[in-house]
Structures are given as structure tokens and as C-alpha cells.
Amino acid sequence: MKMLREGVVLLLLTGCLLLAQDADTIVLKNDNQKFTILSQIENRDESAAFLTIINAVDPAARYQRANSFVSKYPQSWLLAQAYDAVARSAIDLNKYAEALTAGRFSLRLLPENPSLLVLLANLEAQKSLSAKAIADASAALDYLDQIERPPNMNQREWNSLKPQLKASAYFARARAEFSQAAVSLSDLNKAAAWNPEDPEIFYLRAIVELRLQNKREASQDLAFVRKNSTLLREKAEHMLALLGDQGFADRLPERKIDAALRQETIKPSYPQILAQGYAGPDACKSCHANEYAAWRKTGMARMLQPYKRENIIGDFSPTGRFSSDEIRMGFDKRPFFEIARQRFYVDFTIGSKWQQGYVTKLPDGRMQVIPIEYNLPSKQWINYWEMIDPPGSARAVIADFPKLTPATNYQQNCAICHTSQLKSSESLEKAVYLQPGIDCEMCHGPSAWHAKQAAKGNLEHPDSLEPPFDFRQATNRQAVRVCAQCHRQSAVREFGENAEMNYSTKGDFVPVTWLRPYDAFSRKAFFKDGRFRESTFIVEAFTRSACYLKGTAQCATCHSPHLANFETNQKSLKYWNNPNEMCLPCHSQFRDRIAEHSRHAAGSEASECVSCHMPRIVNALLFKVRSHQIEIPTADLTERFGQADSPNVCLTCHTEKGVTWAREQLTAWRN
């Protein structure tokens, strides 16, 4: 455990020195942006103080410096990392209660920290905090199966550390389950598989094997302990003597290790890609006419459209103006933008609801996104890149657009979530797609064979009449993974064997996608309390919610792309006129207690579940959308960071009140 702690301390801390990722940009494997998390800290003294934590070698020095940092800079962007350092050094100094307190606060700000979760799970198991140990170990294993290697480690280093983390997590969970008198052989087998050199794992497994009357396996494990552990050798010899059978004790348990590893590497079961591939949305129309007609009206279908005059929502009239003279708009048979005396015609539109971007296509196949977009609610042109990028963004300089750089290229930056079946041809900037917008098969899978067999009414292959990906049969995690193809900012994109970018031609329809660690992104994407500030992280927020983690909620619990009322219900909400119905099927105890529970009159907007549990605090450029973290309101982090960096939902309506009032109200509500 001590070696594991030392191995990950620098991993977590030095991550703040690494290149960070812009928000709202495709995340490609081995690709980072040109600024660091630490460089975004404006206070130079604060940055210097944090560097002293990184440079501390002695646990006592690191403990002192980290505690000094959190005391002096209680509102720092780096609190998650600083409290992480407090927790790890406190464990080394046997300050276990303080380690748990600091570690839990760090995880509150950044829950997706598997190495810290592993350390706390082991400590909690040791202290008989079994429920917490099981929860933390399980969360760590979940994240380790999703998050790619930290960018400050090379693949070899991560390949060495990750098995240790997984082994330690399985061991902690097994130890906690064992203390609850639960049989935990499966987790111990996996722990031994990931770390076949740890005698403590084999010792605990021997005890479980004895409980199960598996004397042969127990003897083999005890023999391994006797040979490899000075600390446990005497206990192992005593137990072997009691067993009284040395005939098979010296054979090492290779069989169980190999089997556990094979079990661990099996991929989730998803419907397989069909050989005949993709049919296109029109193939769905004859059998699914209502769904097809409804989909055609949605923002998904119209995410990217070839230019048609009736699709334009921007103001290209003579009175339409941008705030700068660097660019002007006009209309000459079709809309155009003029920058540095060069004219760029609109060939495609991006978006169709409250905001619209414009694309010009070059003769060589590249599609370039004009820097300004039109915001319909405010009826104004905005510099999109300037609003979402950190200061100094090159693509936000309108006068430089005629350089037509990769930074403003549609295929490289936007197409993976705005078009269907995207494939890189000769270069990423010239990638081609089968369908503009998001079509049926992006969600339901490749359907050529399905459509062909359905058209024939072929009963020889009844399985073909089922959709390639059936949401009715999927778990909530499988279903969310489909939506996450476009709605998860942190997804790391890798090309398929034939340069496919957002679809598969063989293997699993929705393959497991690695996620870039969240602390590798620009601080502009977060509030200081750790919640997501930008709407591009909507799946990341939702997968933190108890509704997803402990329940069965998925995107389709509340949304549907097949509703007929899209013109008036642009959020595709299933219960547009009665939003509480999204929550009450699971939380039925509140159905007749809405006013009592919400402390607002039943039927009022304030009494709706989403008003308190999904507040409008997330940026969508010029307006706010609802957070999808779905949490119980608190006030303590607002007291620490302030309303701007930790919005309290009560104060978003009761603006005349203060945070002390909010805390008192929430305390009374809980009591």
C-alpha cells in the first residue's frame, strides 16, 4: 500500500502541470491543448505554494505544505488536488481520521479519482467502515474501466500502476465484504489476477476458501504466503499444520489467476455489427413512418443541413450587424460573410433551434466554420470561439479566419457529433460522412440487414426483425453510452481500422470509449465546487447522479427523439406539461406530498422537482440550461466559494437573500 501511495501522489499532483484540453472540442487520443491547469491560476503566489507540495518528498513536509495551502487558499481551483495530498500524506503519518476527512472532501470536488478512492477504500476496510469501503472500491473499479491513462504518464507506467490499483480495489472490497460475513471469493480472485505477488491477498483468500471448505485451494494459497511473506509466514505455517495436508500445498494457484484475468477482459455484451452495414434513414421510413416523421423535425436530424434559404435563422439583412467591423454579412443569391476582403458563402448550417453556425466548403473538401454564430433568443451575432475558449485562442481572431487553419475546420472539431457515420479519408480535415445530422442508425445501430429482412417479412431469421440495438433490452449504462457518443465532452476518440470516426464496421456497435480525466480540462468547464459549468459535459454530470449510479435512470427516462410536438417541445421532453412525472415513478412517496416536500405551492414552477434538483446554472452561451447532476441542494460550498463559483439553487430565485439564510432554510428542510 505504501508503494502504491507513493506512486500515485506525484501522478495526481503533477497532472496540474500538464497540457489541458479546451471545452467543446473533439478529444483525440494523444492530443492536448497548449496551456496547463496551473497556468490558469492567476495568483502567482498560489501557484508557487502548490508547486512546493509537488516538490515535497518527505510525507511530513508534504502534509504540512498541503495543509498550509488549503488554509491560505480556501477558494483555490486546486483544492481537490491539495486535499488529495493531505489525505495521502496523512495516511503515511498514521493520521487516519484526518486522511478520511480530507480524502472525502477532495472526492466531493472531483469524484472521478480512482487512485484516491482505492486508498480510502483500503483504509475504510481496515477501520471496519465496510459500506463505505465497498462503495469506494466499486467506484474506483468503475472509473478504472473508463478513464484513459493520465496524460502525465506514459503507457508503460500506466500499464504498471493500473493493475496495482485494480488489485487493491478488489482486495479492499473483498476485505469489507468479508467483515460483513459475505463470501467475497470472486473479488479476491480478481485481486490476485491483477496483482499475483501480494501475499496479503492470498492469505485472505485462503481464509475464504476454508470457509467454503475448499481445503486444496486454501493450502495452495497458504503455501504461497509462507514462501513470499515474512510477516504472515508464521500464521500460514500454523494454518497449514492444522489442515494436515502438505501433498498439494506447494502448487501455486495459477488456474484461478488465469481464469479471473480472462473473465476481467471480456467486453460488455452489445449487439454485433451486421455485415451489410448501414442503410440510411430513408430505409426506416416505410415501417416506422411516425417515428421517422417526428425525427425529421428534431434538432438531431437538422444538426447539419445543406444550405436552404428556409433553414436560415441568422440576420443577413442590411441591418444585421456584428459588434466588430472585422466581418460583415450579406446576401447574394445565398448568405455570405466577408472577412479581410474575402467572401465566404454559406454552404451548410449547424443547428436549427436557438443558435446557428455557418460552414463554407472549400474545393478540396474541407469545411470551415465561420467564427461568428447567430443567437436567436438575443437576436445577435456572437463570436463563438471567443466565448468558449480560454484567453488567447487563435481561432477566436476573426481576421485570421481566411488562413483556413485546422482550428476552424468542421470535420476536425465538430463533425463527429454533428454528422453520421463519419470517416476520415485522406486526412482528418477532409473527412466524409454518410448522412448530415444525426440519423436513426447512430442510435439504433447499422440496420441494412434488418431493413432488408423486414421488407421481405422474412421469418427465417426472426432475430433480424429486432432492432440492432434495442433500448428496451439495454441496461441504463448501455443506453446512456449510446447518447454519450455525442453528449460526452471527455470521450477520447480513436479511429477504427478503416478510419471510422463515430461508428463501427465490425465488433461492438457502441464500443467502450475511454474518457479523458476531468481534471485535464480547462477550468472554464467547471465551477469551483467541482460541478460542470458547460453544457457539453451533460453526460459527465448525469453519470455522477444517484439516479444513474444507484437507480435505472437513463437519458430516455426523460427525453425522446420521436415526439410529434418538437416545434413547441424543443427539449424533446416526454412529460413536457408535467415534468414531475419524470421523477415520481421512482420517488412515488412524494406524489401526494409535493407542497410539503418542496416547501412551495403544488403546481407552481418552484414545486417542480427539476427546479431544486436540476437548477439552471449551466452555460449554453447566452442562456442557462439545467444541471444534470441531479443532487440534493447544499449551502456549505457556496459559503466557501460564493454564489458565482458554487451556485446555491435557493439563491438563484431568492436573490435578495444571502447564503446564511439558504443554509438555515436547508437545515430546517432536512430536519
Summary of predicted features, one role per range:
Residues 216, 244-247, 251-275, 282, ...:
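Primarily the internal scaffold of c-type cytochrome electron-transfer domains
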Residues 74-77, 111, 145, 196, ...:
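Short coil turns that delineate tetratricopeptide repeat
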